[in-house]
Amino acid sequence: MAAKTYDAGVKDYRSIYWEPQYQVKDSDILAVFKVVPQPGVSREEAAAAVAAESSTATWTTVWTDLLTDLDYYKGRAYAIEDVPGSDEAFYAFIAYPMDLFEEGSVVNVFTSLVGNVFGFKAVRALRLEDVRFPLWFVMTCPGAPHGMKVERDLLDKYGRPLLGCTIKPKLGLSAKNYGRAVYECLRGGLDFTKDDENVNSQPFLRWRDRFLFCQEAIEKAEAETGERKGHYMNVTAGTMEEIYERAEFAKEIGTPIIMSDYLTVGWSAHTSLSRWCRKNGMLLHVHRAMHAVMDRNPNHGINFRVLAKILRLMGGDHLHSGTVVGKLEGDREATIGWINLLRDRFIKADRSRGIFFDQDWGPQPGLFPVASGGIHVWHMPALVSIFGNDSVLQFGGGTLGHPWGNAAGACANRFALEACVQARNDGRNLEKEGKEILTKAAQTSPELRMAMETWKEVRFEFDTVDKLDVQHR
C-alpha cells in the first residue's frame, strides 16, 4: 500500500530500504556492491542508500510517493557481509523487483544499478561486484548471434582451441601491406587474424580498402591450406548508419566474421549489431577496449564479471577475457570464473572464483573466451591448460615478432598448440611438463625452435591489482 501520510524532509534510508528479513524471489534481479561508506555512516544506512538511489528514491520525501506502491517497486538491501582483509569496505546485497526494468534492455538495468548512485555522497567508494539475472530477463535478451557450436560447424574445426593474431603495428600500415600480413599469418597456420580495437577508418587505412585486401588474403590462404580462415573486420564507427554500412559490405564480399568494440561503441549500438549478425549469418568478435577504466580499481567501478555477463546478454561470439599469463591484468581464479560465465549454461555461486550468485543462462549459447595480450609460444602449455578447447588464443607480437617473419611465427604457434593438445590428450600435465613438451616438439619444427629462443627471457611478472577478496585454499 502507498504511504498514508506525507512527511517532508531528508529521508532516513535505513528505515525504508533495509530489510534483512526479505526473502529473495526467483524473479528478482540481484546485485552485490562493495561499499566504502563515509565516516559516521552506518553499514545499514549506506546499504539502504545504495538500494534507494539505484531504484525508486530521491533525497527527500515527495508527495507523489502517495500515488504509487513504493513498497512493491523499491530495491531492498537484504544482507551485509564483511569484505575479507578490509576494515572499511563491506558487501551490500540488494534485490530489485522485476517490474523496475524494461524487458531485454541491459541499458535500462544498468542506468539504475550504476547510475547516479555512484556519485552519491553517503559512500566514498562503490563497486558493482556481481549481478544475478533471472531467467525471465535472460530470455528477453538476444544473446550470442551463433555461439561456440555453430561457429565450430561453420569453420569445421574441432578438438582444439582456435588460433588468432592481431595485426601489428596496430596503426600506420597501408591497406595492401595490412592484407599481406593477414595472408602470411593465415597461410602459416592461424585460423583468424584481427583488426586491433582502434583500427576503424583512418586516412592511411580506409575501411573499404582494408576489407577488400583482407578478404583477398583470406581467400588466397584458404585455397592454399584447404582450411576455413577469417579476419575480424572491425566495423566500429562513429554512427550506427556507418556501422551497418561496413557490416553489409563485409557480408557482400563474403567475410565470415566482423568485430565490435562493445564498450566504446555503446551498449545499444552493440546490441543492434548483434541482432544484425544473427539475421545475416555473421560471426561477431567482441573487444573490451575501455574495460579497465571501469573494472581495475578494486574499490570503485564495475567488476569485469559483470561486464562479461552484460556482453553475454547483448550478444557476441568471442570476448576478450584476459590471459592470466600475459601482459594484461587478470587474477587466475577470477579469470577462470569469467571463462565459466561466458561458456557454461549454468554457473553455481563460487566465492573462490568471485562468483556470488548462481546464474542460469537457459538456452542462450556460450561464446568463446579470447586470451590475448603479451602471449607467446612459451605460454602455450598454460593457456591450453587454463582455457581448454573452447577458446581463442590470440598471439599478436608473439606471431609477428618472429625473426623469420609472420608465416614462421604463425607456424610456430600452430605447432606448439598441436603439441600441447596431443600431450594433454595423452594425459600429461601441461603446466608442469610444458617446457619438455615444447622442447621435444621443436626438434621437428625449426620455426618453433627459433620462437622459443627468441622469447625465452620474456616475462610479465607484475602483480595483479584487482585481486579476489578471498583467500585461495
From Swiss-Prot:
It comes from Cereibacter sphaeroides (strain ATCC 17025 / ATH 2.4.3). RuBisCO catalyzes two reactions: the carboxylation of D-ribulose 1,5-bisphosphate, the primary event in carbon dioxide fixation, as well as the oxidative fragmentation of the pentose substrate. Both reactions occur simultaneously and in competition at the same active site. GO terms for molecular function: magnesium ion binding; monooxygenase activity; ribulose-bisphosphate carboxylase activity. PROSITE patterns: RUBISCO_LARGE (PS00157). Keywords: Calvin cycle, Carbon dioxide fixation, Lyase, Magnesium, Metal-binding, Monooxygenase, Oxidoreductase, Photosynthesis, Plasmid. Heterohexadecamer of 8 large chains and 8 small chains. This is Ribulose bisphosphate carboxylase large chain 2. It catalyses: 2 (2R)-3-phosphoglycerate + 2 H(+) = D-ribulose 1,5-bisphosphate + CO2 + H2O; D-ribulose 1,5-bisphosphate + O2 = 2-phosphoglycolate + (2R)-3-phosphoglycerate + 2 H(+). Signal peptide: none annotated.
